[in-house]
């Protein structure tokens, strides 16, 4: 029973981590919280590091990668675990809007990673990532998660798509998300979410994500299903393994990038 409870708690932590990590930037932020809560010391790349034996440290780069390591009491080799912070998805291109037939707007996206395209149809989607904005105190980067059902990639009725079963999907044609009507303004949306004026958005790096939450299922609750299991299950597991490791003779490294 104790082992079952431990497994259940770990599963719940994993699914909460994935739900809170709709983009690689959010995933790295959440991993940093896990590390800091466990007493790991944050290091900055532009500072001189003074390391002590027996302590654990971490540093980040670009907001999309995090490297954690422990300094052994007696060095006897190293052990490394690594994973990706990103997941297969659609990335919004710089020319973000496509007007179709003068009546509605689609997002101009491109495939990112090894995607199973058919799974993206007819489900609520939203956007997450980061924006670089201009503020009174200078230029800064802000994380964004538009936490609502924002867009969808619709499939057409069967009588409008004869032969579709044999059709090879083209992400640049068949899988452009429907954003809104003719008045939809992507740049205004990003500015609103970032809390700045439209002209103060310098750039943005946004990705689509499915709105469904992860679930436990099966006759004995033996399975889990969730968006972004590739590769956040590994990113979470790598971090947990690093934090729970007790080997004091190895240089332990967890690299999530």
Regions found by a protein language model. Name each.
Residues 1-257:
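N-terminal hydrophobic/helix-forming segments and targeting peptides
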């Amino acid at each position: 029973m104790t082992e079952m409870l431990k497994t259940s708690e770990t599963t719940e932590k994993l699914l909460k981590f994935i739900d809170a990590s709709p983009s690689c930037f959010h995933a790295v932020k959440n991993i940093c919280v896990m590390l800091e809560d466990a007493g790991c010391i944050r290091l900055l790349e532009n500072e001189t590091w003074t390391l002590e034996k027996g302590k654990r440290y971490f540093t980040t780069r670009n907001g999309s990668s995090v490297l954690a390591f422990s300094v052994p009491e007696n060095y006897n080799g190293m052990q490394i675990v690594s994973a990706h912070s990103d997941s297969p998805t659609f990335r919004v291109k710089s020319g973000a809007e496509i007007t179709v037939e003068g009546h509605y707007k689609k997002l101009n996206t491109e495939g990112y990673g090894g995607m199973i395209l058919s799974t993206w149809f007819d489900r609520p989607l939203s956007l997450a990532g980061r924006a670089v904005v201009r503020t009174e105190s200078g230029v800064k980067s802000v994380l964004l998660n538009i936490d609502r059902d924002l867009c969808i990639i619709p499939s057409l009725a069967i009588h409008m798509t004869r032969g579709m079963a044999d059709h090879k999907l083209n992400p640049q044609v068949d899988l452009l998300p429907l954003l809104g009507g003719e008045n939809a303004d992507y740049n205004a949306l990003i500015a609103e979410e970032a809390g700045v004026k439209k002209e103060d958005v310098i750039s943005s790096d946004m990705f689509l994500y499915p709105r469904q939450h992860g679930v436990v299922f099966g006759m004995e609750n033996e399975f889990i299903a969730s968006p972004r299991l590739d590769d956040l299950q590994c990113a979470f597991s790598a971090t947990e393994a690093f934090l729970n490791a007790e080997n004091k003779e190895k240089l332990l490294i967890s690299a999530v990038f």
